[in-house]
Amino acid sequence: MNKKRQILLSAVLASALASNAQVSINVDASNPGIKVSPNLYGIFFEDINHAADGGLYAELISNRSFEDDDKNIPTWKTAAQEGAKINAQLINKGLLNNAQGKALQLTIAAKPAATASLINEGFWGINAVQGRTYKLSFWAKGSYKGGLKARLTNAKGDKVYAETTLNAKVGKKWTKYTAELTANGNDAKAQFELVADGKGTIVLDVVSLFPPTFKNRENGLRPDLAQLLYNIHPKFVRFPGGCYVEGQESPENAFHWEKTIGPIEERPGHKNVNWRYRTSDGMGFDEYLQLAEDLNAKPLYVVNVGLWHGGMTPVDSIQPWIDECMNALEYANGPVTSKYGALRAKNGHPEPYNIEYLEIGNENNQPDPAAQSDHYYERFKKFKDAVLAKYPKTVSYTHLTLPTI
């Protein structure tokens, strides 16, 4: 025991002496080491835990297209004053377009002295900020006759922060209506109300409410969150996933870029099965690329090599996935005279986004091929060869699991 104590005491004394010792470090500046790339530091975005809808994407209406459930209407409810009635039900006929799978039909019996309301609670509340102006838009048709108002209220509905009378003469054809509301108070848990004082039916779809956005981009991002991303000065933005790229159960649940561009009413959205909720794809391919541009960062696009969690396309049949990748690159990089470059210009961005970095697959080549992908190296080569043949300056990356590195 005494010997152990002596050793311990000696160690403590040695440590104390060492802490007071002078240490010299010689640096040979004439012999630098490996040059470190300035592009190593970047950010990665994946729609997990509502990182897009309800997060960075500025849309305030939750379940805006009524697609989140086949039977119920999550985040929406109705209310009626005494003497009024309102009924809401999902319908799947006479829809706005082929991208929309459902709409909401309201049957209303109200009057100015007894109104009826459709209410949306937003994503855990709508943030009403005094002096802030919100842009409302929605599509509607029906037989309704009477007045309509849009409001922001507190959660109980007994305090109005913003209100506007809508010039909405509802007719038989789908029509887009727009309005603005300016809040006169602050409430992080506010709600949106559409208030009716007449009678008839209204069929609604794509009800949208936007606050001001980062750099005033249409269909843009929350300025507070996007500014924080800007402040860290990332050199690249990796998107859109992650497992989000691949989806689960079927290839329809994967991220398909061409379904995420254009007007929001033309985006069908998809089931984000990996993370257990539906996404509107309002934050789509253009929005990711625009984010990278606004952050002065390079986009790093992750493409699917032909798989989804629970299934895959055989390696000898992946040409459609390669075509999808090549079309995405043409949309991002092609001239306006090209098919997809012209579509990019039509959607508001004639100048190329210039994707230089491409990640081919996500966490592929798992030890158990059934879990992810067989023949990953062959898949990688097929993609890389196709990309470099048309875009020789594009840098292709792989993302493997540890046992293969």
Region locations from a protein language model:
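Surface-exposed amphipathic alpha-helices with a cationic face
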Residues: 289, 293, 329, 333, ...
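Extracellular and organelle-lumenal recognition/adhesion modules and their flexible linkers in secreted
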Residues: 22-281, 293, 298, 313-319, ...
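Active-site groove signature of glycoside hydrolases
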Residues: 241, 338-371
